[in-house]
Amino acid sequence: MKLKNPDKHQSLSSNAKVDKIATDSLKNETDIELKNMNNEDYLRMSEHESIDPFVSASTIQTGIGIAGKILGTLGVPFAGQIASLYSFILGELWPKGKSQWEIFMEHVEEIINQKILTYARNKALSDLRGLGDALAVYHESLESWVENRNNTRARSVVKNQYIALELMFVQKLPSFAVSGEEVPLLPIYAQAANLHLLLLRDASIFGKEWGLSASEISTFYNRQVERTRDYSDHCIKWYNTGLNNLRGTNAKSWVRYNQFRKDMTLMVLDLVALFPSYDTLVYPIKTTSQLTREVYTDAIGTVHPNQAFASTTWYNNNAPSFSAIEAAVIRSPHLLDFLEKVTIYSLLSRWSNTQYMNMWGGHRLESRPIGGALNTSTQGSTNTSINPVTLQFTSRDVYRTESLAGLNLFLTQPVNGVPRVDFHWKFPTLPIASDNFYYLGYAGVGTQLQDSENELPPETTGQPNYESYSHRLSHIGLISASHVKALVYSWTHRSADRTNTIEPNSITQIPLVKAFNLSSGAAVVRGPGFTGGDILRRTNTGTFGDIRVNINPPFAQRYRVRIRYASTTDLQFHTSINGKAINQGNFSATMNRGEDLDYKTFRTIGFTTPFSFSDVQSTFTIGAWNFSSGNEVYIDRIEFVPVEVTYEAEYDFEKAQEKVTALFTSTNPRGLKTDVKDYHIDQVSNLVESLSDEFYLDEKRELFEIVKYAKQIHIERNM
């Protein structure tokens, strides 16, 4: 999509006046002025020249699309959904034309500058072709059986093909982890491992219908559990190895480092975070999962395609060091927040009235966690003579940025800056999309267009991008040096919703990093890579923080809480809603002191006592108690598991009936027990109040009348 007419933007902007007479020097960061040059037109890049993206958007879209599709089918999906998922994956990973697997290989090879050995490449591609053909045959048989599940032959065929295909995955996975080639083969390994785990899930879902014995189903399930651990640990190990190998000292090395971090998150880590949710014993119904990690797109800065003019590329223009860039643009672990307002402060790089560039020089961001207080941060120069530009994004998802990287060139000294950005946004719950822009004018400078969708494409291409976008803008960093001002955008996945809504008919996973505040002693720390985001930690007793949750009716629905945690000590977890205690239980240590966090150190265990919410919006709090200081307790996420409504309603009614009856003597049903106190009657009244109107409305009214009678007797007795 092309940027709109610059003149149109200038006429619309109230801050479009260009300061042509500015005299401040670069030292106070108000103007950047450099001497003229005779061959400036020769060196200058063409107007609106598009930067060739480091990777084709379609390459990344494959990873984003598969993860997005799986997010919609977690738990135990319908048979038709599973067949549809396989059809989608086959189309993405084994399309007609050039092999997607080869594209994955070439992409990682280019980032890390390491070619895969010819033998390893050919062996992997050959095994992938075989797996693709076998998966297509299984998919066809699965669809035939789904259409006629009572057909004995169709059932026998799909069962036999399933067993053969699963064994084939066991045999072929090592081809994607050849010694010395683990890093360049990592996206292939992750996608193949993901398919194997999805396939193993089928035995738990369909095995009984296919005629598999209980022992056979158990074998497949146990293999799924073991392989989930092994595949996760392999992916995290080699992701970290590849990333550490790219760590450098200058800005150019940071570019490759960040590209690897971003693309491997999209193609590998996002899938790994979903692996545990394939477990049908733990997630037997529809499950809602969320990715809270952040990815950082390429810095907005000109990149000259001709090596003769490499000095005009931003990272060669005396840019900050690797560590300085990391510190400036990569956020410290924090609670998930949403961008609400950006105030932009501008600088002016000017040689003449026909060659100048107003550019982004600094900014103030306002962000807010779900239900929390406003947080403000600033970067760069905020003390300039040019009027600031303020853009509002409250309750809006910025799903795309189109940015102009500008180059103002004089003699041998280039100036890299950002003269213009279009922010495309949408209200998440409404069919309303528009854009805000930053633009104060420029002339006679070279520009390159950088479109965020080249790096973070929509999940699908069949819908408008404002409907199928995969990420939202969450933060903006600034790489700042004497002649460089380059923006770095931070993005969160769309699955991390704004509401923390708990559904009555599905398991809801809410990462604890979505809390709106941190308790004293609690900290947000980097996630280990397989959690889909950062996690919270305590080293002494106390609460972690509060989560604002929204409840979809019916309120009669009851839930059980589960916690995915890791701990170096035995402890107690306590939970409460709106300050009222609901659960307390003992939990075991999962790891030893000094041990690294890996897949096996985390467990998902819950409380047995169910509870219900009484308000549409509530505050959920969790704390860790009864352990010695110096230990470490980590929480990844909280899970709300719905309990069958009708069964729970019946149980609650029987319990309330017993409590009401217990107020009176057994010999005289109308006689109140002498030891009944006022607070006893109030407790019973609250219990009756919590009964379901949907299932026991008449009985509830009758019990209320009895409680009122007990209250009346108690008052008369005291008088």
UniProtKB/Swiss-Prot annotation:
Keywords: Sporulation, Toxin, Virulence. It comes from the Bacteria. The keyword Transferase does not apply. Pfam families: Endotoxin_C, Endotoxin_M, Endotoxin_N. Coiled coil: none annotated. GO terms for biological process: sporulation resulting in formation of a cellular spore; symbiont-mediated killing of host cell. GO terms for molecular function: signaling receptor binding; toxin activity. Promotes colloidosmotic lysis by binding to the midgut epithelial cells of certain coleopteran and lepidopteran species. Active on Plutella xylostella but not on Bombyx mori. PANTHER family: ENDOTOXIN_N DOMAIN-CONTAINING PROTEIN-RELATED (PTHR37003), PESTICIDAL CRYSTAL PROTEIN N-TERMINAL DOMAIN-CONTAINING PROTEIN (PTHR37003:SF2). Toxic segment of the protein is located in the N-terminus. Belongs to the delta endotoxin family. This is Pesticidal crystal protein Cry1Ib.
